Every structure is written in C-alpha cells, then in structure tokens.
C-alpha cells in the first residue's frame, strides 16, 4: 500500500541495554541508551513502561488518514492501496495519570537559546486552551537536542507566550527554564517525563 508518511522518526520497540556504573561513566551510559532516538521514540518507550508498570495510561493519538484509492479483490474484502496522512488537528498525546486527564505535544529544536513558536499551529494552542477550560492538564515536552535537555512546559505559559508574541518569534530558553520543569536523566525509561509532571502537579495543588 502506498502511504505518504509525514516527516518524522519511526517508533522503536526496543531500547538499548546498558550497564550502569558510578562516576563519569554513568552519564555516558545514559547517553548511549538514547543514541539515535528521537523525542517521540523516547516518549513512546516511556509510555510503554508506564503502562506495563501500572503508573499511567498515555497513548499517542492516531494521525488522521485520507484514503485516495481502494481496491476490492473480493466481494467481502477491501484493500487500501493509496492514502496520505492529514495534518493532526490537536496534540500528539493524551491519557490519565494520578486521576488527572493530561494532554500534551512533543517538540524538538536544535536551537540553544530559544524555541521557535512556528513549531506550533494555532489549532494546537486552541486545543490546549480547551483542555485547560475543562480542568485538564496541558503541556508540551520541549527538547533542546543540542543541549540534551528536555522540559515540561505548561500550557498556561505557552498560551501566554503565544498571545504575547502573536505566534511569531521564539520563547527564550531562560523563560522555559523559569516556567518549565526539567526532565531528569534516567536509564529506564530514558525520558522519565512523569517525574517532571509530578513537580508540575505539586504547583497545581
């Protein structure tokens, strides 16, 4: 079947095994475990870990597909032979953690000093605002790939920056540090982002 896939990385189903040691080799082992993995790969592996250990139920939302051509090799069967992915209308992930509905997107940048707002679409901002209006928890996981740092950035802060900058320019790295929550380094899962969500929850209570 000919499917036109959007730019991105494939989901990995296995994670590299590491032998942890103390001292300077610890960080090297953590880095090796994430080598070649994109942000979505790390989130998907973390979600699998959370589900298997009964910590949370969080899934990646399916991307809407537009079907272009269908063949019917048999009266009782239909085969999609050509389709393409449409632009996602909301965010990447949603689920339940500690009795709360959470909804979030995942973004990466190579920039070291700021995060471009052009990486978001207005409908995503509107969606996160709607989540907040229903007492849900919304945020974005932002990864600075050049710094190997990831942050939970609250939807409230993102919406405020979007309105202030009118969806243009960038959010300063220092602003993300000030209002966000650093995801700590971890071995399994490699991106234990719920640790940062826990800190976020503490400030919400």
Swiss-Prot record:
Primary enzyme class: hydrolase
SUPFAM superfamilies assigned: Restriction endonuclease-like
Keywords: Cytoplasm, DNA damage, DNA recombination, DNA repair, Endonuclease, Hydrolase, Magnesium, Metal-binding, Nuclease
Superkingdom of this protein's organism: Bacteria
GO molecular-function terms, A-Z: endonuclease activity; magnesium ion binding; nucleic acid binding
Keyword Metal-binding: yes
Residue numbers binding Mg(2+): 90, 92, 105, 124
Cofactor notes: Binds 1 Mg(2+) ion per subunit.
Cofactors demanded by this protein: Mg(2+)
GO CC field: cytoplasm
Disordered, as annotated region: 1-22
Predominant location category: cytoplasm
HAMAP family per UniProt: RecU
Family to which this protein belongs: Belongs to the RecU family.
Function: Endonuclease that resolves Holliday junction intermediates in genetic recombination. Cleaves mobile four-strand junctions by introducing symmetrical nicks in paired strands. Promotes annealing of linear ssDNA with homologous dsDNA. Required for DNA repair, homologous recombination and chromosome segregation.
Protein name from the UniProt record: Holliday junction resolvase RecU
Organism: Leuconostoc citreum (strain KM20)
């Amino acid at each position: 079947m000919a499917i036109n896939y959007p730019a991105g990385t494939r989901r990995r189903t296995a994670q590299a095994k590491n032998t942890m040691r103390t001292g300077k080799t610890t960080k090297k082992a953590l880095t090796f475990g994430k080598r070649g993995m994109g942000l979505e790969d790390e989130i998907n592996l973390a979600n699998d870990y959370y589900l298997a250990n009964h910590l949370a139920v969080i899934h990646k939302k399916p991307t809407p597909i537009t079907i272009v051509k269908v063949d019917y090799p048999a009266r009782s069967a239909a085969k999609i032979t050509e389709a393409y992915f449409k632009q996602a209308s909301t965010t990447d992930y949603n689920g339940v953690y500690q009795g709360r509905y959470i909804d979030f997107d995942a973004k990466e940048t190579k920039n070291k000093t700021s995060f471009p707002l052009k990486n978001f679409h207005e409908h995503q901002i509107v969606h996160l605002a709607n989540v907040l209006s229903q007492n849900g928890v919304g945020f974005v996981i932002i990864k600075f790939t050049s710094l190997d740092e990831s942050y939970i950035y609250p939807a409230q802060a993102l919406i405020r920056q979007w309105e202030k900058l009118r969806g243009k320019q960038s959010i300063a790295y220092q602003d993300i540090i000030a209002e966000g929550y650093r995801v700590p380094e971890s071995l399994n899962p490699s991106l234990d982002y719920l640790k940062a969500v826990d800190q976020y929850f503490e400030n919400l209570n």
